[in-house]
Amino acid sequence: AGGISLAVADFVRQEMKDRGIRAGFASGGITGYLVDMHEEGLIDTLYDVQCFDLAAVESVRKNPKHVKITADRYANPDNPEAVAGQLDFVILGASEIDTDYNVNVTTGSDGSILGGSGGHADTAAGAKLAIIVSKLVNARVSCLVDRVTTVTTPGDTVDVLVTERGIAIHPRHTNLIEKLKEETNLEIFTIEELLDIAKSFTGQPRAVTRGERVVAHSLYRDGTLLDPICRIAE
């Protein structure tokens, strides 16, 4: 879980309070931010597949509508009642995203394995709107690239990229793009334009040199092979 995507909950909380919005449920890795929103009456039920902090642990103990669920109930693609398929929107992080909106949270930009992807691909596929949040450039490395090192979540399930330098919306959402351009002052770019902005800071990144030996596979939620993960060349 990316720190930015987790922290966004606090901004969502304030918007919900200002606009009088109430949510039927929130799910995923539960944090203290979501617990606060639940206890304030902003979220009716928390469906918890993983506690991310001690505030969430304490909430499970005392709040009857903070409900522990299994990974099957959370995101099994063969379970018609999976919570991931009932999401209106999801906010996710990324180590890389490319111009086809493919997302990588499996490996770093150097090809080293970061860890498991959790419900990243599941929630992106199930939600009506999948939003990726990330710094465009971090420590002279761009999160936006021509092609991700490893595909974790396919781009056809991703809708929006939000960065500190601007927002890119998948071109299939023409109505959303037009609405935001007409009614807001948000910086809306094509994803190719955002990539050019990133490269103006970082230059053209060097390609990762991979060895021939496959050490792991990135699989989609249905078991489809998305990408081989190769040993980093020495």
Which residues are covered by each model-predicted region?
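Conserved phosphate- and dinucleotide-binding cores of soluble alpha/beta proteins
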Residues: 7-16, 20, 33-234
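Glycine-rich beta-strand-to-loop/alpha-helix junction loops that act as flexible
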Residues: 1-9, 28
